[in-house]
Regions:
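Small-residue-centered hinge/linker elements
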Residues: 1-256, 261, 283, 287-392, ...
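A structural motif shared across PLP-dependent enzymes of the aminotransferase-like
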Residues: 274-277
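Extracellular glycan-binding segments that recognize GlcNAc-based cell-wall polysaccharides
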Residues: 280
């Protein structure tokens, strides 16, 4: 009897053990299959269909830096999401390559997901679109609605189509900021400002109740110039008369009244768009141009897949190195929103020590940042020149303050016509809260061996020797 029970339990255990192993192996095979399938999808080299339309989607923020589309694995696209950034070089490279590629019959620009783009980036993409149009092929843009910056790109297309319920939102340029000076005074906060340069106006928000004359003058200077550039670019690309864009803005209330409040009709009447179409109507138009059958979808290829499909040759022998400096300049290592002096210095040093690097192009797109970090980077560029290698700075949307400082080490500086550049000084700020504590009946006290030991104590008045 005991032996029988033992045999039963052994049989059950073998069955359970078999099922356990089978389940583990099945899970392993499923995971392995998913991994192999994912790898095959991600690393598969796309093919370029004959007569395809190249789809160029500007998504999120247009930036300078990032991995090349032809080399990166886009997990975001695999998950059917949208990318948060678009690399400027990828867009321009794809458009320029398509201009020389007879397999590409046209371009379709998608701008709905474009959130942020600088003036210089708009200008450079516009120039690339103009070069493509010079081949005699068409660029089509369709959107449910255009913001001002989206439209500044779209205006360079051959055909601009808008959804019948959409709008083209041209507003001009404006800015405003809050001034906390009076509030901080009432709260007993004393803000000590140290600066060099009349136009270094950032600290004004903490010590004044409104902008200074210098601040207004500086803002007017760059805004008026930028707005003139936007208007000229749109008017030239669309074949409009000078002043047409401003005319639409100034007469908008009347135009809206005449059109019964229909913003898309206003855009069409002002020749800002070539027609009002739904997405499917635009697809049918593209299909007709390709000679496709009704009901089919037009042959297209995404610009990232297009770049991945093109064969790249490895660099052999001498080459020109390109290093990108983008974002706020800070001490230490580079991060998501800024560039660190250690990271940049290492990249530049690598170029200097590489015997095959014949020259260095530094692409600058930075509003500035730490003075010390900027000097560290500038010195590394200077060492490249001392090593006998030419250094060229190419300025993007911004190259101000520290961004301009590092550029001074170059043999030559090239800026876009709409680059915001210049050096307007430096500043430092330190708030002290002795009056705030007094209002709250909070006392402070202590000792120090020297007057500098408590120099950073924000609960004490600033020593007059610092003023």
């Amino acid at each position: 009897m005991i032996r029988f029970v033992k045999d039963v339990f052994q049989a059950l255990w073998k069955t359970v053990n078999f099922l356990r192993r089978a389940c583990v192996n099945l899970v392993f095979l499923v995971i392995l299959g998913l991994m192999l399938g994912t790898a095959a999808f991600l690393f598969h080299t796309p093919e370029v269909p004959e007569g395809a339309i190249l789809v160029v989607s500007l998504e999120g923020s247009v930036v300078e830096s990032g991995a090349s589309a032809a080399k990166r694995v886009s997990l975001t696209r695999l998950m059917a999401g949208t990318t948060e950034q678009t690399q400027l070089r990828d867009v321009i490279d794809a458009i320029d390559r398509a201009a020389k590629d007879k397999r590409i019959s046209g371009l379709l620009m998608r701008l709905d997901d474009l959130q942020s783009i600088g003036m210089a980036s708009i200008h450079e993409i516009g120039l690339a679109m103009d070069r493509y149009k010079a081949t005699g092929r068409r660029i089509t843009v369709w959107s449910g609605g255009f913001s001002q910056r989206q439209y500044a790109v779209a205006a360079h297309a051959s055909d601009v189509y808008l959804h019948p319920m959409g709008q083209v939102l041209l507003t001009g340029i404006g800015s405003s900021r809050l001034y906390w000076g009076e509030l901080l005074k009432k709260a007993g906060v004393t803000v000590h400002v140290f600066k060099a340069g009349a136009y270094k106006t950032f600290p004004e928000a903490y010590v004044r109740s409104g902008p200074s004359a210098e601040s207004l003058k500086a803002d007017h200077a760059w805004m008026d110039d930028a707005w003139a550039q936007i208007q000229d670019s749109i008017q030239m690309a669309r074949g409009l008369l000078p002043g047409a864009v401003s005319g639409v803005i100034e007469s908008l209330p009347k135009l809206l009244k005449d059109s019964g409040g229909d913003l898309s009709a206003v855009a069409l009447k002002a020749n800002l768009v070539d027609g009002l179409k739904t997405r499917d109507e635009v697809n049918n138009l593209l299909l007709e141009r390709q000679g496709g059958k009704k009901g089919d979808l037009p042959k297209t290829i995404d610009y990232r897949d297009y770049l991945a499909a093109l064969t790249e040759t490895d660099t052999v022998g001498k080459y020109v190195a390109v290093v990108t400096l983008e974002g706020e300049i800070r001490d230490g290592e580079s991060g998501v929103s800024g560039v660190g002096d250690r990271t940049m210095a290492s990249d530049i040093r690598t170029v200097r020590q590489d015997p095959n690097a014949a020259a260095l192009v530094l692409r600058v797109n930075s509003p500035g940042g730490s003075a010390v970090a900027s000097e560290m980077i500038r010195r590394e560029l200077e060492l490249v020149r001392e090593a006998g290698k030419p250094v060229i700075v190419s300025m993007g949307d911004y190259a101000a303050s520290g961004g301009y400082w590092v550029s001074l080490a170059a043999d030559k500086i090239v800026a876009d016509p709409v680059t915001v550049t210049g050096s307007i000084g430096v500043f430092g700020m330190m708030p002290t809260f002795e009056k705030s504590l007094e209002k709250l009946s909070v006392g402070t006290g202590g000792v120090s061996t020297t007057w500098l030991a408590k120099a950073r104590d924000a609960t004490q008045p600033m020593d007059p020797r610092f003023e």
